[in-house]
Design a protein with these regions (language model features):
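Acidic (Asp/Glu-rich) sequence patches and key acidic residues
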Residues: 1-111
Length: 111
């Protein structure tokens, strides 16, 4: 079963930021984007997906967004969905945390 996470931040998660953050956390991987950049995926050397990142979206209803995650931060402007495919979530979680750190955000579990 996939692990569904959310990256909450005030800075947009872009392909450039993902690639820079992943270079340290997942140096042997490759970043691939789909649908004009709306979906990004980090894959391992065998092209197996490790982490999928969807385009950041502005938070229109902060209270509702905060209620959808475990232990939300006090404020955030952007919501970025992150999925780790089935299997060991450890590598994907580490990369997600590195991306969050690169944009000054946090990774949270969905409720």
């Amino acid at each position: 079963m996939a692990t569904e996470l959310v990256l909450l931040s005030d800075v947009e998660v872009t392909a450039d930021r993902i690639v820079r953050a992943a270079a340290d956390a997942h140096p042997e991987g490759t970043y691939v984007s789909y649908r004009g950049g709306d979906i990004g995926q980090l894959v391992d050397v065998d092209a197996n997906p490790v982490l999928t990142i969807f385009a950041s979206r502005p938070v229109a209803h902060p209270r509702e967004a905060a209620a959808a995650v475990v232990d939300p931060p006090a404020s955030f402007a952007l919501w970025t969905e992150v999925n780790i495919p089935s299997g060991d979530p450890t590598p994907g979680r580490g990369i997600a945390e590195a991306i969050a750190a690169a944009v000054g955000g946090v990774i949270k579990e969905r409720v």
